[in-house]
């Protein structure tokens, strides 16, 4: 009998991280690898943010904070939501976390009992199902289709809800698809939540990276909602680990208790840097967003030219989710072939659910020169295979 718990054994690995590890092995062996597999901004964190962190450390902000987070940061977040979304968020309903992933644990830990279900897209970010499974819940996937912009059909979401359903998980802009849910989509999902009594769990980590319209938060449409967000993507702060959960009032104290026991609090000086990010770094966010958009406009047609199918162009985030079945049905095997034979690292679509099989995710968190080199290598590989 294995000494490892069944709970740990059941957690699915991030397959893309295995691709990352192999890419690094090849680089250490002297290979030049075009890295298009990971969602990590290639920009440095804006200097105004790093200076704020340095100043906070020099001022002694190296100790514990309240588990809910620094009041200054929570108040800055309420101001941001008021100015950017015209939504009033009570600072008391915000829990600051060490990245958005811990916020997900707080959310599902406060919401789910064993056997409870969460409706989510297929394909979607794989951690959602892993968190739900780990806590004894049941993911309930609903297929979304490239031909429909990877957006939910409301009637299929409604049909997936039963007496054990606690939440509908959404992610807009989305990973891996770059899909953005419009006002009509969000209104329809909010109406389902109000009708059925479930909550919406909205992962909004890619807000600030929408190329076709304004950011929309689910809080504009219903208060039966949890919001997951953070600083990693738009502010180029993945390594800083700073996120937050906005929760309905009844769930704040339960989430706080989980935070106290699992994480205690986010780093003090990083929270101070977060305040400055919200107040002073928006021009940097817009500069990076504009550059990502240029890359998006290059990469989509370039991938089409070498034989990949893109029915739904990304409207947000920094990913292109391309149908690669012309090159092979098995996306994992194809990703490894492209890495070993072409020197290009990609994320296999199967990592994001059965609905992603046959697809590859390309990150454009790399400069245009590297994107062009990756496309050149892939085109050569496709022509010679």
For each feature predicted by the language model, list its residue ranges.
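A glycine-/small-polar-enriched, mobile loop at the entrance of the PLP active site in fold-type I
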Residues: 37-41, 55-74, 83-84
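Short, contiguous pre-domain boundary segments
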Residues: 1-7
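PLP-dependent class I/II
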Residues: 4, 14, 19-33, 40-56, ...
């Amino acid at each position: 009998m294995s000494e490892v718990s069944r709970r740990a054994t059941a957690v699915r690995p991030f397959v893309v991280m295995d691709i990352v590890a192999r890419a690094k092995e090849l680089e250490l062996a002297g290979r030049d690898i075009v890295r298009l597999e990971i969602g990590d901004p290639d920009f440095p964190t804006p200097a105004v943010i790093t200076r704020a962190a340095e100043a906070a450390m020099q001022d002694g902000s190296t100790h514990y904070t309240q588990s809910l987070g620094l009041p200054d940061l929570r108040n800055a977040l309420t101001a941001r939501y008021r100015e950017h979304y015209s939504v009033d968020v009570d600072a008391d309903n915000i829990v600051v976390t060490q990245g958005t992933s811990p916020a997900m644990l707080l959310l599902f830990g406060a919401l789910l009992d064993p056997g409870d279900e969460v409706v989510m897209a297929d394909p979607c970010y794989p951690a959602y199902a892993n968190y739900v499974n780990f806590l004894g819940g049941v993911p309930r996937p609903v297929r979304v289709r490239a031909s429909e912009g990877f957006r939910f059909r409301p009637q299929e979401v409604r049909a997936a809800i039963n007496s054990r359903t606690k939440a509908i998980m959404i992610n807009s802009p989305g990973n891996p698809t770059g899909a953005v849910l419009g006002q009509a989509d969000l209104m329809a999902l909010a109406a389902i939540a109000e009708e059925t009594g479930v909550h919406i769990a909205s992962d909004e980590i890619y807000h600030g990276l929408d190329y076709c319209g304004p950011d929309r938060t689910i809080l504009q449409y219903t208060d039966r909602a949890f919001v997951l967000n953070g600083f990693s993507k738009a502010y180029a702060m993945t390594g800083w680990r700073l996120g937050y959960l906005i929760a309905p009032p009844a769930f704040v104290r339960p989430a706080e208790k989980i935070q106290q026991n699992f994480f205690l609090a986010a780093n003090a000086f990083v929270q101070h840097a977060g305040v400055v990010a919200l107040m002073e770094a928006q021009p940097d966010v817009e500069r990076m967003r504009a550059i990502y958009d240029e890359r998006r406009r290059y990469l989509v047609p370039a991938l089409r030219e070498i034989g990949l199918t893109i029915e739904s162009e990304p409207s947000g985030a920094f990913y292109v989710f391309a149908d690669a079945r012309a090159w092979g049905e098995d996306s994992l095997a194809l990703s490894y072939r492209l890495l070993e034979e072409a020197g290009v690292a990609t994320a296999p679509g199967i990592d994001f659910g059965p609905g992603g099989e046959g697809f590859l995710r390309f990150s454009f968190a790399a400069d245009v020169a590297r994107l062009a080199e990756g496309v050149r290598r892939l085109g050569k590989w496709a022509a010679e295979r």
